[in-house]
């Protein structure tokens, strides 16, 4: 209770300071340029640091101890480009507020997760910059960040950066990226990635062959334009000596022609794919088993010769037994899918990207499902959590 009161006091103080900064900015208006603006920005960053450190403070030593087996491996690029064990990870949409859910999920699985995923869109807003604070916090917790980096091109000041004024900047956007039109942004990301100083996984422009989802897809770009853009981005990172990035290419194999978007072995380290069971939530969906989803894609993706990653694994509850779905999935992984080397749970409890209603994929408080996964990991898998001191997770 005492620690909780301290936390509330710190958070309250940080919030009040943040409000004061905002009001100060409003008062100053255009006069806040120059040194004053820089000072206020620094103060704002300090507020974020205090708040963020407060939210994870006290958990770091226990979680790092439980991930001791991963400590040396997470700084070994050769291991991370083809690990000899399966790396679990998670995305939780509430990470922006805190890592409490992720730490609780560790406890539910009795296995702290080596990878933590965040999503960042391209643009000039604060939340579209390299997520240094989150990356550092993830590393401090003993894990590594996987950043899904989404090349939306709407949030750039086109006049400031001498970009042509167009109705839709995403139309032929990958061609513009390949020509270096957005290097002012990509270079800054590369510099910050290098400054982070640790290995990062980046999933760039995922599901690029899906004509219905994202603007970097075939409705706006040709396959060769996407490839050229991908190769250009990777080369910019190399030119900035950001060799600590591991690149994850993640198509949507449910649509044909995904092979046409492959950037080449020199530019790809991992191949990723989502495995999401929508059940009967929509007229176009049905209850699919894990085998019917991932099993249908496995051989197609394995031919690239790269380690495979399930970047989003989840199932809704409508139309079947979710606990059984996960159990069958994890029971099948070691033998049937040997090239699969990473699985990231998709714990999004407010997903509104597919339907006009919110979907809850999270298994955070699904005790039966977490127990089934935990049992499967420990009884059928030669998996590193067997070596972990899981009783240190609280």
Which ranges hold each PLM region?
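N-terminal substrate-binding region of glycoside hydrolase catalytic domains
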Residues: 60-182, 315-318
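Substrate-binding cleft of secreted/luminal carbohydrate-active enzymes
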Residues: 26-97, 309-394
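Glycoside hydrolase catalytic-domain groove-lining segments
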Residues: 131-150, 261-319, 364, 372, ...
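Eukaryote-skewed repeat-based solenoidal scaffolds used as protein-protein interaction platforms
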Residues: 194-197, 217-277, 294, 298, ...
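Substrate-binding cleft of extracellular glycoside hydrolase catalytic domains
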Residues: 133-245, 392-393
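Aromatic-lined carbohydrate-recognition surfaces of secreted/lumenal glycan-active proteins
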Residues: 90-91, 205, 230, 234-257, ...
């Amino acid at each position: 209770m005492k620690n909780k009161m301290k936390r509330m006091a710190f958070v309250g103080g940080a919030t009040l300071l943040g409000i004061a900064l905002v009001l100060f900015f409003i008062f100053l208006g255009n006069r806040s340029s120059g040194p004053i603006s820089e000072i206020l920005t620094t103060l704002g960053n300090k507020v974020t640091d205090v708040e963020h450190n407060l939210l994870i403070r006290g958990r770091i030593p226990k979680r790092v101890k439980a991930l001791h087996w991963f400590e040396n491996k997470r700084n070994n690029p050769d291991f991370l480009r083809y690990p000899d064990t399966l790396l679990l990870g998670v995305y939780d949409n509430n990470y922006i507020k805190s890592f409490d859910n992720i730490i609780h999920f560790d406890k539910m699985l009795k296995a702290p997760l080596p990878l933590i995923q965040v999503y960042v869109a391209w643009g000039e807003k604060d939340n579209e910059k390299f997520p240094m604070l989150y990356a550092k916090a993830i590393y401090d917790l003993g894990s590594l960040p996987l950043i899904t980096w989404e090349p939306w091109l709407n949030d750039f000041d086109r006049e400031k950066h001498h970009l042509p004024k167009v109705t839709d900047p995403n139309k032929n956007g990958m061609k513009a990226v390949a020509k270096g039109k957005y290097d002012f942004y990509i270079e800054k990301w590369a510099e910050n990635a290098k400054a982070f100083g640790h290995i990062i996984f980046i999933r760039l422009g995922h599901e690029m062959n899906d004509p219905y989802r994202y603007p970097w897809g075939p409705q706006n770009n040709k396959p060769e334009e996407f490839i050229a853009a991908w190769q250009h981005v990777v080369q910019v990172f190399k030119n900035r000596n950001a060799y600590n990035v591991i690149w994850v290419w993640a198509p949507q194999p449910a649509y044909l022609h995904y092979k046409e978007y492959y950037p080449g072995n020199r530019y790809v380290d991992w191949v990723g794919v989502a495995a999401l069971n929508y059940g009967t939530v929509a007229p176009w969906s049905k209850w699919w088993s894990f085998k019917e989803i991932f099993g249908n894609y496995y051989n197609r993706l394995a031919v690239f010769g790269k380690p495979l990653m399930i970047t989003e694994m989840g199932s809704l509850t409508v139309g079947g037994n979710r606990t059984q779905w996960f159990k069958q999935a994890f029971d099948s992984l070691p033998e049937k899918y040997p090239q699969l080397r990473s699985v990231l749970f998709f714990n999004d409890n407010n997903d509104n990207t597919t339907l006009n209603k919110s979907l809850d994929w999270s298994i955070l408080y699904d005790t039966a499902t977490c127990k089934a996964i935990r049992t499967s990991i420990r009884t059928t898998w030669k998996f590193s959590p067997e070596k972990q001191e899981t009783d240190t997770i609280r």
